[in-house]
């Protein structure tokens, strides 16, 4: 029986070795004044540039990943994400191809963009945003379900490609939705895995529906980035 058992183990291990796996790095864009103002504002797809801290943090994220194989960087078309992707690429030790990817653009907050959160959501809608995101409806905007659908299309495209690794530079709402997809969690858990500005996550992809999070929201390097890159 022992030779048969050994053969079975060999067959099973060969299947394991042949299992297709890919790696996704996920980076949230750097800080903007809309994030850090005493009364923060809804951003979405309006153009808000990175502030000095945001630029320093992006450079630090690039340093953090400098020796990793990060593949192509797929970035949201919104300039703050492109600016963040550029900083990361500039501080990587190898050549990095940057690709604008419409499927990872920020959620459209419709008529709420540019307003303070209280102006946009008030008490009633704000309650849905915080406590019942699955019920949230944004006039002239997007639902979280629509965001999930387009992110799944990105997964399909990446999975079917020859690429083994990629990096996504996107936005807070997108990283929240991605965390739900990685964990197969319901939209009610939208706020459970929040990523800080310029946080970095690494995820193993086993299929378009199966993922393992290796680490989430690494950000310990940001303070060092402030010391190194902020103007005195």
Language model: regions and residue ranges:
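Residue-level preference for the first positions of well-ordered beta-strands
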Residues: 24, 163-169
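Active-site metal-binding loops of divalent metal-dependent hydrolases
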Residues: 30, 165, 172, 219
């Amino acid at each position: 029986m022992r030779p048969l058992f050994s053969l079975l183990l060999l067959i099973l291990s060969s299947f394991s070795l042949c299992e297709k796996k890919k790696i996704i790095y996920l980076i949230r864009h750097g800080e903007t004044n809309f994030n850090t103002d005493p009364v923060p504002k809804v951003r979405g797809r309006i153009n808000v540039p990175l502030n000095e801290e945001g630029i320093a943090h992006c450079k630090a994220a690039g340093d953090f990943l400098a020796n990793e194989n990060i593949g192509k960087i797929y970035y949201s078309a919104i300039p703050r994400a492109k600016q963040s992707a550029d900083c990361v690429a500039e501080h990587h030790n190898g050549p990095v191809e940057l690709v604008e990817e419409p499927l990872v653009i920020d959620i459209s907050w419709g008529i709420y963009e540019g307003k303070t959160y209280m102006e946009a959501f008030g008490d009633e809608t704000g309650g849905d945003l915080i406590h019942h995101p699955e019920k949230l409806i944004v006039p002239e905007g997007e639902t979280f379900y629509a965001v999930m659908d387009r992110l799944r299309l990105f997964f399909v495209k990446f999975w079917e490609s020859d690429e083994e690794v990629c990096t996504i530079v996107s936005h807070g709402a997108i990283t929240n939705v991605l965390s739900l997809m990685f964990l197969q969690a319901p939209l009610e858990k939208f706020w459970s895995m929040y990523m800080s500005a310029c946080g970095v996550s690494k995820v193993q992809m086993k299929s378009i529906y199966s993922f393992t999070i290796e680490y989430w929201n690494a950000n310990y390097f940001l303070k060092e980035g402030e010391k190194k890159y902020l103007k005195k």
